[in-house]
A protein has these predicted regions:
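Aromatic/His-enriched, Gly/Pro-containing loop or helix-boundary segments
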Residues: 1-2, 117-125
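Hydrophobic alpha-helical segments typical of transmembrane helices
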Residues: 97, 136-137
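Short coil/turn linking the two alpha-helices of tandem helical-hairpin repeats
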Residues: 141-142, 217
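Short, intrinsically disordered, charge-balanced linker/junction segments flanking boundaries
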Residues: 207, 214-217
């Protein structure tokens, strides 16, 4: 885990340092950025720069989630990674990221929700996180037209879909999980329960299950 900080305390100095005595360095995975963006609206330029800085800080050999509080390797960001491909042309990084998730899959076929896993015992699998793995592989194939991606990951994706069907479904509906749609537009996240009062969990779980089946087919 990488802990976010707002303030730093420095100990052991004999003299009071000035601001010029301190240096901060941004550390992240090496990037190959394609193109740039600028316009006459400085607000848009600032938003673009802040978003790009945030995305860079999220790359630590894998995609980090929630930089402001718990930067773990939740798999969910993988489901939207395709939106980064056109700007961050890093096929080896993205492939390594997908391989990490594949290698962390369990013998029963389940895909963990966090890769690398939390220290100690991994948590139970969750469709809303594990399903991002298949989506990442599929988006990479579409972006780079590399059939070997499908060959490398097909069996693991199939095992994951079979696991959902066997252990998490009642008929065609996914009924087992713990995360849900907790980012309702205009409302604060449901921190205490991680699910929306407006979206049934089974709806989002089953939609992701269906998406994984389409990818597998």
């Amino acid at each position: 885990i990488y802990h976010p900080v707002q303030y730093l305390q420095i100990k052991g100095l004999t003299n009071k340092p000035s601001i010029d005595d301190l240096q901060g360095r941004i550390v992240h995975t090496d990037e190959n950025l394609e193109g740039d963006f600028s316009c006459s609206n400085e607000l848009f330029n600032t938003i673009h720069n802040n978003v790009n800085r945030t995305l860079s800080n999220s790359l630590k050999g894998f995609l980090l989630d929630c930089l402001h509080r718990e930067p773990y390797g939740y798999n969910e960001p993988a489901s939207i990674a395709a939106s980064l491909f056109t700007r961050k042309h890093m096929p080896l990084f993205w492939r390594k990221y997908a391989t990490d998730i594949r290698l962390a899959a369990r013998e029963d076929g389940s895909v963990g929700d966090v890769v690398p896993a939390f220290p100690g015992k991994p948590r139970d699998p969750d469709v809303s996180q594990g399903s991002a793995y298949a989506m990442l592989v599929w988006y990479l194939y579409q972006a780079y037209d590399d059939r070997s991606l499908l060959e490398e990951h097909y069996e693991t994706i199939k095992d994951w879909v079979d696991y959902i069907k066997k252990y998490m479904c009642e008929g065609p509906i996914v009924t087992v999980g713990w995360l849900g749609d907790h980012m309702v537009p205009g409302k604060a996240p449901g921190y205490e329960k991680w699910r929306s009062d407006e979206t049934p969990q089974s709806l989002s779980w089953t939609a992701l299950y269906y998406r994984n089946i389409l990818i597998l087919s």
